[in-house]
């Protein structure tokens, strides 16, 4: 049976999602930040006859994330999703790719990435960080956006600044940076921060300063901070060279993540 989830279901929903906390980072983060009853966010669940959860679907604005611990049944949600064209869907690849064969759905453009997590700081080098790494405030947003706009492979949209500002204001994301002569030359952010984990996004270094290990130093600082807080860091990558850097610092692949946009 499928029905909308409410805050009365929270304990059961959270216990279900927590077993794969890293993969469910976005759903957990959105529930903690916005709850079950806003105009831009809804959750549905399919229950077995004995009352246990079989699967969950999150709507955040016009994007959807499905999740199940077992074999996902796409037909449970097809009628609900068929109204959205093209459908913006993302999630664990083994789940969302099942929707490709649903005749009533029109999916957006597909993008597949590696999903990895870092559980602790055991793999970090013993040498102390030799650069000053700062935590951004609202006053630094303009300089961070300037860095991003100077990087050809870093897509920035009108929404990017708004998202960065909202993350800092709501404590759902933070940005670390290194500056030289008042100019930010490298930065990395988190998004979807929740009680268990956070997603690493926006890893970037100005082209004139690459090859000095600045991004790695910022990531080391982030790993140290989140390990102290008892939280897991996660990230997506599709560039094998970047993947090697992340793995040296202790990130491990835990699956594939597919987005349709």
Q: Where on the chain are the PLM-derived regions?
A:
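Conserved beta-strand-loop-alpha-helix junction that forms the acyl-donor binding cleft
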Residues: 90-96, 233-247, 259-261
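Short amphipathic alpha-helix that is part of the acyltransferase structural core
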Residues: 1-26, 120-158
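Active-site rim helix/loop that mediates acceptor-substrate recognition in acyltransferases
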Residues: 22-40, 48, 155-181
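Conserved acetyl-CoA-binding loop-helix of GNAT-fold acetyltransferases
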Residues: 72-79, 201, 205, 211-225, ...
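Conserved donor-binding loop and adjoining core beta-sheet/short helix segment
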Residues: 1-2, 15, 21, 29-84, ...
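Conserved acetyl-CoA-binding loop of GNAT-fold acetyltransferases
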Residues: 103-110, 249-257
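Acyl-donor-binding surface of acyltransferase catalytic domains
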Residues: 48, 60-129
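Conserved active-site beta-strand-loop modules that form the wall/rim of enzyme catalytic pockets
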Residues: 144, 172-189, 197-198
